[in-house]
Structures are given as C-alpha cells and as structure tokens.
Amino acid sequence: MKIANVALALVCVPVSYAQDGDALDEIRAEMARLREENARIRGELDRMNRARDPELDRLMRAQIGMAVDAAMAQVQSEQQMTAGWNDGFFLASEDGKFSMELGALVQFRFIHAHRPDPLRALQDPDINNWENRWGFEFARTDLLVRGHLYRPELQYFLNLGITREEPGLVNGLGFVKDLWLSYDFQNDWRVRVGQFKIHHSREESTPSSAQLAVERTLLNEALNLGRTQGIELTWSRPRDVLTFTTGDGASDPSSDNGLGFYVAPNDGTLPSMLNRNALKRDVEWFAALRWERLMYGSWSQFSDMTSPMGSAPAAMFGLSIHGQKGEATKVPTPNRDESRWASFAADISWEFGGSSAMLAGMYGYIDSGGFQDQYHIYGISAQYARYWAPKWEWFARYDWAELYGQNYTTEPDSTGNGGTVGYFAQADSGVLALGVNHYMDGHNFKWTTDLNFTIDQTDVLFFSNVASISQDGEDGQQVVLRSQLQLSF
C-alpha cells in the first residue's frame, strides 16, 4: 500500500513543478519516510514468515484452494444440473421454467394402550374387549411432489397418501390429500386454488412431521377445519400475515369420532375432504380468516414446533374465525333443514433458543338444523419443550375439551311452539402427554416417544383413531405409549 502511494505521488506531480526547489524537497522527504516505513513492514513480514512452518503453510494454502474450487464447482454444477439430489430428488428443465421435487413422509409407530374400563361390544369389539392392546402401524405414508411451472412464482403441490384403517376409508387406498396451484404476485399478495388445509389453528397448519408429540391433541382433532376445495388469498407484510379462505366448506375431521352426529346429522356441514362433485350439496356460504402477528424473530422459525439450541428468540400470535351455512334441500319441511357452524381459535407461540412453548384455545358453535340442536365445544391446550443436548428434547403437553348444549327430545310444531328441550353438559376430556424427541437428522430422521394419560372418561365425542386414544367407560384412565420412527425428505 505504501509503495502504491509513492507511485501515485510521482505520477501526480506535474513536470512543470520539477524546478520548484521547495516542492522537490518535500517530495524527497516523503519518499525517504516511505522507504523507511516500507523497510520496517518488510522486516516484520520476514520475521513472521521465518516463524511459520513452511509445510503447514503449504497445506493451508492447498486446503483453501481445494475448498474454493469445490465451492465453485458445486455452484456451477447446481446451475447446470437438471436432475439429482439436493435434500430431495429433483428434476428441472435447462431453461429453468419447470421444476419438480420428489419427497416422502413415512411414520412407523409402535402403540401400547392400557384401558382399565373398556366399553365392550362398542366400536371394534376386538379392541374394546381387551384392557391391554399393542401393535405396529404405518400412521402416514405420503408421496410429496412440488415445484414450479413456467416461472418460479407459479408453484404447485401434490400430496398423495395411503389410507390406514380408519372409519369410512378403504384400507391401503391411494388418494389425494392436497392438490393446489399458487401464484405469488411479488407485491405482498398470493393466491392459491385447489384442495388444501384451511389455515385455522397453528397446530393443524404445522405439518404432522414437524410436531412435538407423536400425534396432535384431541382438542385439535375435534375442532380443526380440515380441508376444503376452494380459493385462498394471502396478504403478507414483514410482521403480519392475513389469510382468507372460501370454497366448498370445512370438512369436519371429528366426524369419524362421534361429533359428526352432533355437527350434521343431515350432512349439511360435512363435505368430504376428497375430490367431490362441484354441484353436490355442501354449503350456501363458507369463509375463514386468520391473522398472524410476528412479535419478534423470523417467520421460518414457526414452520415447526421446536426451537433448537443456539437459535434466536421468537414469538408469534395467531387469531382465527370461521363461519359457514349448510345448504338447504329446498324441500318444504316443518323445520329448518340446513345446519350452521362457526368457530374461533387463538394461539401464541414462543421460541427461546433451546426451548419452546405454545398456548392455544379453540371454540366451536354448531346448530345442526333438523333437530334444532345447538352445541358449544371449547377447550385449551398448552405445551412446553426443552433441549438437554443438541439432538435430544423432552416435552410436556396437556389439552382439555368440553361440550355442552341443548336438544329437543320432542320436536316443536311448524310455528316453533311446543317441544321439550333438554340441556346437557358433557364430561371433561383431558390428556397429559410426556415425551422425548431424538433428532438424528432434524425432522428428516426423527424418533419420538410419548406417554399419554387420560385424566377423565374419553367418550364418543372426543376419542381419536389416529391418536390411538379410544372411547372408554366412566372409570377409564387410559395410559397409551406411542413410539414413532419418522423418515421425511
């Protein structure tokens, strides 16, 4: 640097000033000072070179060179490759207009369930006649396909699942869970059309592969909105996201558990989540709205429920509302034959860099129409998780739900007079889960085990097939051990 300064000074001195004695003296003095400074720096560099091991210096230079070459080669290779592996299999056109990534999710479970008060002859008698049952299952087996068409802003997603043995589904049948197209307008707006999950509760919106426990809470199973076929609009800002959804109505996931009878005995609010006829009876109108506020941190931190060691603190708040009216038959009847359904959800999540927490509440109001029955379902859930080693995490979770309402034991007349009204309150249903996660390769390869204790009776309204928590008697305090090995890419 000093030598360069001298050269610059010599170039910049005009020849016309060469005869000026004072100017030449100043230049000579500055050159002498720079020569002394340059000599001192060279001496210091020579001393440092003599103190350094020549072989070590050669190896360091070679390693740095190889690392740079490898990085350059990887960048060039990824730019040129049209097929290969990059955290998943991918295909792409040479011009970059088309891409396809192939992924999969496999969840293999061992279940042991102890029920001291089974309800014999109800549900599956092979299960209910035994206090202790155990076995293995593939809870989820999904093939995931995603990518873009024509330009990166036009995204697509396909989720092909294999059904497990559940009520109303053929075991081992391949079916479409999600199939949608989305377009990002690059001006804070995004639109999605197709079949997809309704963005209502954070627990349901977070993928099953990114949960803390083996399965979601009974509260979520009772009150989440499932999937719809329709359109979704998303408005995003650095700290706020607003999502509006409309379409063929929410698909009540609890219909397989028993709530379906209370929600819609006439199928008024219960559209199937599978591909359905556009003109089939479903809803007269449906709307769902969710607002999320990022208080601090980044949005990507809330793509799962965990907060690894060393990650930054973050917090997010979410608020959701939903309403829909079932489609009437237009056939003259003495009573209203369409059902109505409204729900509300709120949640707040924290990440502390090595630990995480979430508190959520949900509420649902159902007017089932034909019997003029009205029901209120509500509950809360709370969870906390903490790492004790970089890849090991323990967690605790509790959820509680209750249903109360009124129904007519005898129907009123066509003018609404008469009839006998009965009021009832359903017993509380609560589950405490204690568990551990071992992240062998993040969520891509993960082992999860939890032990679940039902605090009170698990009745026909709140049991969950996929959670392996079954209906039991009044004195039933179940203990369910679930251990899951997950492969995801």
Each model region followed by its residue ranges:
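Sec-dependent signal peptide recognition
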Residues: 1-9
